[in-house]
């Protein structure tokens, strides 16, 4: 992370003022994207600046760098980073490999087709070359979805949703989120009563307020 932090400070200066969209800075910004991928770090603002520079300077477009930006955006789900990045890529480039495959993976994740996502990823593992921590970042997102969706879930189903994890691997994620299993193979996620805390809203309306409203409506 030392290299990332050093580059982040330098890139932060580049992104200020009119130099933000100076094409001469593209090489530095592209190296910064590669550093994010290798060091499992993330800087959305810088990555959006790269995509904007590609919009302004189509001849400089780099498919590999754009693919890395999209994959890093997926690691930050459920935030809308992936959609923001996708909207800055023209349709012609969206049809190119590997961008087309990454957009498909993103669609599977955003629509919670997790088993299909892992199958598609397994068929395109070359996409993750140079990307550190991608799969575990996706698992964090899936656990987030599970946590707000389920009270109980079958052990085998959770293992599938997280990418066909072994029993020992599954236990690590269960421990991380405080989930427990019973003898029947069910995993207890949370109690609906504990996760939902209703608020009682009391609004006081005095007679003067009502009378003024009635008067104005006549």
Swiss-Prot record:
The keyword Acetylation is annotated on this UniProt entry: yes
**What range(s) does the PCI domain occupy?**
42-204
Alphabetical list of Pfam families matching this protein:
CSN8_PSD8_EIF3K
Keywords, alphabetical: Acetylation, Cytoplasm, Initiation factor, Nucleus, Phosphoprotein, Protein biosynthesis
Record GO biological process: formation of cytoplasmic translation initiation complex; regulation of translational initiation; translational initiation
Q: Which residues carry this modification: Phosphothreonine?
A: 28
Q: Which GO terms describe its cellular component?
A: cytosol; eukaryotic 43S preinitiation complex; eukaryotic 48S preinitiation complex; eukaryotic translation initiation factor 3 complex; membrane; nucleus
Q: Which residues carry this modification: N-acetylalanine?
A: 2
Principal localisation: nucleus
Residues the record lists as Phosphoserine modifications? 217
Compartments, as annotated in UniProt = Nucleus; Cytoplasm
Q: In which tissues is it expressed?
A: Ubiquitous, with the highest levels of expression in brain, testis and kidney.
Gene Ontology MF term list: ribosome binding; RNA binding; translation initiation factor activity
PANTHER family recorded: EUKARYOTIC TRANSLATION INITIATION FACTOR 3 SUBUNIT 11, EUKARYOTIC TRANSLATION INITIATION FACTOR 3 SUBUNIT K
Q: What does this protein do?
A: Component of the eukaryotic translation initiation factor 3 (eIF-3) complex, which is required for several steps in the initiation of protein synthesis. The eIF-3 complex associates with the 40S ribosome and facilitates the recruitment of eIF-1, eIF-1A, eIF-2:GTP:methionyl-tRNAi and eIF-5 to form the 43S pre-initiation complex (43S PIC). The eIF-3 complex stimulates mRNA recruitment to the 43S PIC and scanning of the mRNA for AUG recognition.
Q: Which family does it belong to?
A: Belongs to the eIF-3 subunit K family.
Q: Which HAMAP family match?
A: eIF3k
Q: How does this polypeptide assemble, per the annotation?
A: Component of the eukaryotic translation initiation factor 3 (eIF-3) complex, which is composed of 13 subunits: EIF3A, EIF3B, EIF3C, EIF3D, EIF3E, EIF3F, EIF3G, EIF3H, EIF3I, EIF3J, EIF3K, EIF3L and EIF3M. The eIF-3 complex appears to include 3 stable modules: module A is composed of EIF3A, EIF3B, EIF3G and EIF3I; module B is composed of EIF3F, EIF3H, and EIF3M; and module C is composed of EIF3C, EIF3D, EIF3E, EIF3K and EIF3L. EIF3C of module C binds EIF3B of module A and EIF3H of module B, thereby linking the three modules. EIF3J is a labile subunit that binds to the eIF-3 complex via EIF3B.
Give the protein's recorded name. Answer: Eukaryotic translation initiation factor 3 subunit K
Q: What is the lineage of its organism?
A: Eukaryota, Metazoa, Chordata, Craniata, Vertebrata
């Amino acid at each position: 992370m030392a290299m990332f932090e050093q580059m982040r400070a330098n890139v932060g200066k580049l992104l200020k003022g009119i130099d933000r969209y100076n094409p001469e800075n593209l090489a530095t910004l592209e190296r910064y994207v590669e550093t994010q991928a290798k060091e499992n770090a993330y800087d959305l603002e810088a990555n959006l600046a790269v995509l904007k520079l590609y919009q302004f300077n189509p001849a400089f477009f780099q498919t590999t760098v754009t693919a890395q930006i999209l994959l890093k955006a997926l690691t930050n789900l459920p935030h809308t980073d992936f959609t923001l990045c996708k909207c800055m890529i023209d349709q012609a480039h969206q049809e190119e490999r590997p961008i087309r495959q990454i957009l498909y993976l993103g669609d599977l994740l955003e629509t919670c087709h997790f088993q299909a996502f892992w199958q598609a990823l397994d068929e395109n593992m070359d996409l993750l070359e140079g990307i550190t921590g991608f799969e575990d970042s996706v698992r964090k997102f899936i656990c987030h979805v599970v946590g707000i969706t389920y009270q109980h879930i079958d052990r085998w189903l959770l293992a599938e949703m997280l990418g066909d994890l072994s029993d020992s691997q599954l236990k690590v994620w269960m421990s991380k989120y405080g989930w427990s299993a019973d003898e029947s193979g069910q995993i207890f996620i949370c109690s609906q009563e504990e996760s939902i805390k209703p608020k009682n809203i009391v609004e006081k309306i005095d007679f003067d307020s009502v009378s003024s409203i009635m008067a104005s409506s006549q």
